[in-house]
Each structure stands twice: as structure tokens, then as C-alpha cells.
Amino acid sequence: MRTFTAVVEKCPDTGLYVGYIPGFAGAHSQGETLDELRRNLNEVVTMLLEDGEPTLESEFAGLQTITVP
């Protein structure tokens, strides 16, 4: 079993949740709910892994909060 970190945002125009796996080309999806997005991302990643072991272009390192004056 493999674990990947997804970045998730909510589109203000459509109201959809949009997610992607940083550094994993093609690993992105959307859904009306967070559960739907999770299922969709799982399906996409499973399909991509079936096509062969991915070469990750980068690795998730974390999040930073930036405060500006």
C-alpha cells in the first residue's frame, strides 16, 4: 500500500473541490464533496500506478503560513 499527500482547494467559481498530488504528473481530479474527491483521486492514482511506477517530479515537503503587513 502506498500513501500520497494531496493538495486540495475549493474553486470559488464552481464550488468543486480540486485536488492533485504534488510531483505526480496526471494525478489530479475534482469532486462535489471531499469524499467524492478522495474517491476520484484514489481511482486516478490507482490507474496511473497500474501503468507503471511513477517517477515523482518532486516530493511534498509541507505547508507554510505567510503573514504580510
Each PLM stretch: what is its role?
Residues 25-34:
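A short, exposed loop/beta-hairpin motif centered on an aromatic-Gly-Thr core
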